[in-house]
Amino acid sequence: MTTIPSTAEAKLEMLTTINRAIAGSRPEALPPYPVPAPLSRAEILHQFEDRILDYGAAYTHVSAAELPGAIAKALGNARRVIVPAGIPAPWLTVGMDVLRDEPPLSHAELDRADAVLTGCAVAISETGTIILDHRADQGRRALSLIPDFHICVVREDQIVQTVREGVEAVAASVREGRPLTWLSGGSATSDIELVRVEGVHGPRRLQVIVVG
């Protein structure tokens, strides 16, 4: 009669076998982390613009004085714009139907809005990625996931060159337990037959406005 070992015995036997197999082995040294050659400030800004446009997102670079007009222009005929509590008042212009997320808007209200306007935590030129850590100028995650059009304002001094620098920039947010959202262009996905569908996991359209 065959005796079937218990689950605990089977696990112990498996782990013992693995332990014996690796007992005499030595872990290989990790290869050095590839570090790209440092870019000048102008090169970082150009690289970021190039990546953003490559994703099919829109890109504008303006001065602080030009920012409100750039936001209004990006909105076009869209006027119902959701803004988090921490958006600076000077960013908003007369004529906008501002929907403040105070108290929190319902998902249906977010879906009916024309656009959402946020700031960001940091942006990465190497990958054209924008990271939100959902502080006051970015709002809760739903704001940047449900509306179909996201206008994101990025200060020049928030743009770093590498992913490593970007991760370091939000390390404190991670320690605080804050959620992070990483954006690289508008939302898009493809099925197994490579049929591209936009807007499945977030806004279809992304407008990046760099200010500085």
From Swiss-Prot:
Domain of life: Bacteria
Signal sequence extent: none
InterPro entries cross-referenced by the UniProt entry: FTHF_cligase-like_sf (IPR024185), LUD_dom (IPR003741), NagB/RpiA_transferase-like (IPR037171)
A Pfam family recorded for this sequence: LUD_dom
Protein family per UniProt: Belongs to the LutC/YkgG family.
Assembly behavior: Homodimer.
PANTHER family attached to this UniProt entry: LACTATE UTILIZATION PROTEIN C
Role, per record: May function in L-lactate utilization.
Entry protein name: Lactate utilization protein C
